[in-house]
Amino acid sequence: MLTEIRIESLGAISVATAEFDRGLTVLTGETGTGKTMVVTGLHLLGGARADASRVRSGANRAVVEGRFTTTDLDDVVVAQLDGILNASGSERDEDGSVIVLRSVSRDGPSRSYLGGRSVPAKSLGSFTTELLALHGQNDQLRLVRPEEQRAALDRYAAAGPSCERYRELRDAWLLARSDLIDRRNRIRELVQEADRLKFALSEIDSVDPQPGEDNALVADIVRLSELDMLREVAVNARAALSGALDDMDVSGSNAVACMGQAKAALESTDDATLRAFADQVGEVLTVVVEVGRELGEYLEELPVDASALESKLVRQAELCTLTRKYAADIDGVLQWARESRERLEQLDVSYERLAGVESRVDELERQLSQAAVDLSKLRRDAANRLAKEVTAELSALAMVDAEFTISVTTDLIPLTDYKRSAAVTLPSGGVARAGADGVDQVEFGFAAHRGMTVLPLAKSASGGELSRVMLALEVVLATSAAGTTMVFDEVDVGVGGRAAVQIGRRLARLARTHQVIVVTHLPQVAAYADVHLVVHSAGLDGASDVRRLAGDDRVAELARMLAGLGESDSGRAHARELLDAARKDKS
């Protein structure tokens, strides 16, 4: 429920605060005082587009602040609202209410605040959408649009889940259908691409490269190309350490022999110091002997056949053939091969693959067709009930002979257009255009009097009749949203007399389950208010203020609304009659 709104520098309003209660609240005022700005402010709190031209002349920005409570809402809705608050880091006030604020700068962007935290306007709108249902004169014009009529019917039928399933199937079907059409149109290109990939993969498989093989080959080739030099170095080093491989003379001048002689000489004395040196020489001798042995093994492992280098060079040339075509190194070639195999699976142009895609398209179309039929049935069943309830509401709004109808027809197309349109074949055999919201065309029909031909609403209803149709529809739809604040901005335009009384009576009934806020110019409607607010000019600069009326002030305002009879005794008497009649009607 909306408990308070504060408006600053918006249109004709300089600074104004209005407090709201449960029940029916009406806002009245002379033309030009800015009573519609209250509704404009609520639209801003609902996330509507900010219009800098609405900022009051001389001010830098306009500010709208509202306070909402959620105690009258269903637990499910409250949980959704708490989820939005938690996601944005917003908080409730100590009394559990939530403050929302929107500022509109004359020169810069607008700003939105929810529970003390800055949020995008979209997030603010997501929160207040659950709390406010705003209806204005523009809604009457939207009501004649087919898409708005379908949305109203779906809202009544609770068709959200069915619509969502239909859209999901339609998206999947369109994607698969596009893939099939693309495959058929590009079959030659796909075949050529597949052939190129197969040839390349065959070439790579025939070479059978191993990860890192090209780098290992470079090291081997460098080693083999320096074979003679490596052998000479190793032979000389071994000879210096322990003699040549074929040297059987241990008395030579190599390091092992010399160190052996030194060790023997040191061990031949009784001097402890010299014998300690012998131990150290022995340790070094062990290392030298081991190095000499390993050098011998190295020499034995060196290739003696020059063909080893040739085979390495041939292998390197094979790998270079691949790296020139597919990647900078062998690891890159292997990665390219993996990706190409995946692409080749996608490019499967075999009859079996094409048949598989066709089968998937057919299955998705079958599921989509059934979902469309289910959605159509849901709408048709709901259309009959909704039409009866709206007709009953119109009777309560002084249109006892009015007839309201809803037709739900399938959007069939000629079979010749099947391939050119997003169309599905229905179980009945007909071909229907698969629109984003189903295969149905929804149309509201209306006849104001008995015996008149029912025509589309756009062609048959006057402004006043359209106002009552919209109000009747909203009253019926509102039964599923108890606790929501409903705001009507001059929906009674073009209405007067007995019809105005009936509208006031119906709004009062609606206010038993909802907080209802109405901007009206009709005294018959204003008389039914539980709270009467007037927007009036409060200064020489044309600024307006909002004031709560009671007693004689309220009588005077109703008299003013009665064709400007405010200062006359007859006007006041008539106003009191309206108030008394409304009070009795509500009791």
Swiss-Prot record:
Q: Name one Pfam family in it.
A: SMC_N
Q: Cystine bridges: which residues?
A: none
Q: List the Gene Ontology MF annotations in alphabetical order.
A: ATP binding
Q: Which GO terms describe its cellular component?
A: bacterial nucleoid
Tell me which residues bind ATP.
G29, E30, T31, G32, T33, G34, K35, T36
Keywords, alphabetical: ATP-binding, DNA damage, DNA repair, Nucleotide-binding
**Database matches in InterPro entries:** DNA_recomb/repair_RecN, P-loop_NTPase, RecF/RecN/SMC_N
* PANTHER family listed in its UniProt record: DNA REPAIR PROTEIN RECN (PTHR11059:SF0)
Briefly state the protein's biological role. May be involved in recombinational repair of damaged DNA.
- Please name the NCBIfam families in this protein's record: recN
- Record-stated family: Belongs to the RecN family.
The name on file for this protein is: DNA repair protein RecN
- The protein's organism comes out as Mycobacterium leprae (strain TN)
